[in-house]
Regions:
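N-terminal domain-onset segments
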Residues: 1-39
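Arginine residue identity/basic-tract feature
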Residues: 4-7, 57, 75
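Low-complexity, compositionally biased segments
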Residues: 26, 42, 79-81
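Amphipathic, interaction-prone secondary-structure segments
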Residues: 29-66
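Amphipathic alpha-helical scaffolding segments
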Residues: 65-73
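Compact, glycine/acidic-enriched structural inserts
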Residues: 72-85
């Protein structure tokens, strides 16, 4: 069992793209929902769906075989391909 919160996983993805929570423009999750623990490991999808926007990127939940993480794509055309999700 891999218990995580969206706040933890989003924080990691924000860092990987050179952004931080101060760059967030809007998020569909409440502060409380960001801190709900769920099993992000393989199995069933448990994390609440969301979309989060910064000035540069759009972040969203991704899943494979029940394992959940955060993906992102540029808000504007940047000539960079998006990897398979």
């Amino acid at each position: 069992m891999t218990m995580r919160t969206w706040r933890e996983i989003i924080t990691s993805e924000l860092g990987d793209t050179g952004e931080s929570w101060s760059d967030v423009v809007s998020c569909t999750l409440t502060e409380q929902e960001l801190d709900v623990e769920f099993d992000a490991g393989f199995g069933g999808t448990e994390g609440k769906p969301f979309t989060l926007w910064t000035a540069k990127r759009v972040y969203f939940p991704t899943e494979y075989d029940g394992a959940e993480w955060v993906g992102s794509a540029s808000r504007d055309p940047d000539g960079q391909p998006t990897e398979h999700i």
